[in-house]
């Protein structure tokens, strides 16, 4: 949680932006934005999702379980003195996380959704198409087996990773 010293605070309460990093990244990704936020009298809360950076955990879930991390952070910030309005800034996986969570929490007053994927299955197929000479039926077969393996290991159905379904619920 990054905020100015009391002697530099323009008011007792200040808004805070929670930065949500992307896949294969960590809280370090968001540190570059701290000077910008503080310049505009906005506190910053930057953390590692479970399974990323210095956090415990073995796997990331591209937003599915990370939305639980976001809820914990919002609950924490809501009880901190000096915290005003709460905003969320997500990039890539962090943006997908935000989309899958913010619709149900009216404590979030603003959001920046940067480069979220809309549907994991569509994204996976698009990425596989970049590999030359791989027939589409083979992509479907591999996706089927990978999906089963992830469901067994992580209890996550990849077909439910569709942040686009939550976009229409956000206001």
Task: Tell what function each PLM region has.
Residues 100-156, 165:
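Hydrolase active-site cap/lid region
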Residues 5-16:
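Proline/glycine-enriched tight loop/beta-turn segments at coil->beta junctions
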Residues 34-56:
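Conserved alpha/beta-hydrolase
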Residues 80-92:
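Alpha/beta-hydrolase fold nucleophile elbow
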Residues 29, 60-81:
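Alpha/beta-hydrolase active-site loop
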Residues 90-100:
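Glycine-rich nucleophile elbow surrounding the catalytic serine of serine-hydrolase chemistry
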